[in-house]
């Protein structure tokens, strides 16, 4: 398994993390088998959120872990997220602390390796976030902190008050959904890709040693579903097949390898409940696309080069 440096050289972690969003419908035995399958391939980093399956993803994962003596907590890296509530966002101190207690209870563990703030809260008071993080860090409940879907200035505002470094920003990124790189290459152009929606987020995170985690790595824009095999992206799928045949792997593997080829040293967050699909994604760690192949896929997705 290829490794990604987490934050400012905190530690190395697998370049492919197991996203648990779609695991809430698994039985405890199915979850146990899935966890073992991931660990056997070196994917010991598991990404949760308190809202996934209304908490069921964490609960079933925790039960499968707690009932299997062969699964050791120190062999897993557990990340979860909080801050999204029904109809609003809440990054208050009270809610963060309550959320983490619930997460730990459901996961049957006494600490999280990494806690992320799931979405920016327009009413956030960074002093409250800082106070919550201090309690969680000093009590040993959370070892590291980060954010998800945050812009650079939102991170700056939090970091002004938060004493612990924010080491991760989890954002959507795939071949079609790649404005993070498009606005950097279409600078000074009157094109849709030139619009900087994210405040130079990619460059900011690289400058500040914040690891970018890529969620929905196979998603089309506007939540239209997976682009693999989709009739909306015929040129991209054709190019994926050509390159996949060259490396004797699947198109899924090549689409994941495209993300890992970027020098920002990103970490992929999978979204699959399939062990075979997980294996295909992990296989991307053994593929290094050429510069030409990376750009061919980028252009095949409909992006422009000035």
Model-identified regions with their sequence ranges:
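N-terminal binding-site loop/beta-alpha segment at the start of enzyme catalytic domains
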Residues: 1-76, 138, 219-221
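Hydrophobic faces of well-ordered beta-strands that scaffold small-molecule active sites
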Residues: 14-18, 46-48, 76-80, 115-117, ...
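Active-site mouth loops of central-metabolism enzymes
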Residues: 19-29, 82-94
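Short, small-residue-enriched loops and turns at beta-alpha junctions
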Residues: 24, 54, 85-86, 119-124, ...
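Short, acidic/polar
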Residues: 27-38, 91-107, 153-156
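A structural motif
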Residues: 43, 109-112, 142, 166
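Active-site groove signature of glycoside hydrolases
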Residues: 104-125
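Beta/alpha (TIM)-barrel catalytic core signal, keyed to glycine-rich beta->alpha loops juxtaposed to Asp/Glu
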Residues: 126-306
